[in-house]
């Protein structure tokens, strides 16, 4: 039976190639061909018959068809009009056709409809903005099961002190619970990518954390510019101080509050870091609670990062 499935997948892929459709690596078009990987991804998403599923980059529809068989509806977002047409043709005149909605265009620019789950073999070049578009979407979805480049996936789950721990790690973990599900080798794709892949499960925190994400992202962006430097050294950088001073003066102006006569942004920032016992800390070893406390201290003093 597995041989029949494999032959069917190969035939569909070959039919696409015979029609002159060349897979575009600029769009990250590496088609997932292993049905066992697809089955595992669907199982880990706990897909229900009542679910609306969002898929980004459906390609030739190997995973799309499997989801259509189980879900109430699949919304497939595809930037390549050729593949979008092939996907629609694949389910044409079948019971699956009414359950498929194809959105043609750039996912990052699209206005997302309601969905319960997101399951996708993600175009790797849009991985980071894709994650935050999903996690900042409202209403919250239940979970996402996504295929990423392996190193990117490892960054998502990295903890303070890990070599790969970075701004991506802490920003994602602020908004969601992140779990590594499995590794997927290059030979599971056609054409095979140059890198290894991994599947990750994201479950948005509900309720969301009580923090302005724009402010949070501004703080972590500065802190992780040089994650091995102390915060005291990082916040002495001229461009950082100029940005914070501009924001501070605007904030005071909007509140009709005068600027202190002896005001110096560097002194104010260092004073806050020392009060929080964080002047000697480095971003590489700081967790979510550390950054929450630091952001609250800065904001309470009128220092903003947006």
Swiss-Prot record:
A Pfam family of this chain: RrnaAD
Primary localization class, coarse: nucleus
Enzyme class (EC, first level): transferase
Top-level taxonomic group: Eukaryota
Single GO MF annotation: rRNA (adenine-N6,N6-)-dimethyltransferase activity
GO terms for cellular component: nucleolus; small-subunit processome
Keywords, comma-separated and alphabetical: Methyltransferase, Nucleus, RNA-binding, rRNA processing, S-adenosyl-L-methionine, Transferase
InterPro entries tied to this protein: KsgA/Erm, rRNA_Ade_Mease_Trfase_CS, rRNA_Ade_methylase_Trfase_N, rRNA_adenine_dimethylase, SAM-dependent_MTases_sf
SMART domains xrefs: rADc
Keyword Hydrolase: no
EC number: 2.1.1.183
Subcellular location(s) per record: Nucleus, Nucleolus
Signal peptide: none
Catalysis: reaction(s): adenosine(1779)/adenosine(1780) in 18S rRNA + 4 S-adenosyl-L-methionine = N(6)-dimethyladenosine(1779)/N(6)-dimethyladenosine(1780) in 18S rRNA + 4 S-adenosyl-L-homocysteine + 4 H(+)
Biological-process GO terms, alphabetical: ribosomal small subunit biogenesis; rRNA methylation
Gene3D superfamilies for the chain: 1.10.8.480, Vaccinia Virus protein VP39 (3.40.50.150)
Residues involved in S-adenosyl-L-methionine binding: 30, 32, 57, 78, 106, 121
Family assignment from sequence similarity: Belongs to the class I-like SAM-binding methyltransferase superfamily. rRNA adenine N(6)-methyltransferase family.
Protein task: Specifically dimethylates two adjacent adenosines in the loop of a conserved hairpin near the 3'-end of 18S rRNA in the 40S particle. Involved in the pre-rRNA processing steps leading to small-subunit rRNA production independently of its RNA-modifying catalytic activity. Part of the small subunit (SSU) processome, first precursor of the small eukaryotic ribosomal subunit.
Complexes and interactors: Part of the small subunit (SSU) processome, composed of more than 70 proteins and the RNA chaperone small nucleolar RNA (snoRNA) U3.
Name of the protein in question: Probable dimethyladenosine transferase
Organism: Drosophila melanogaster
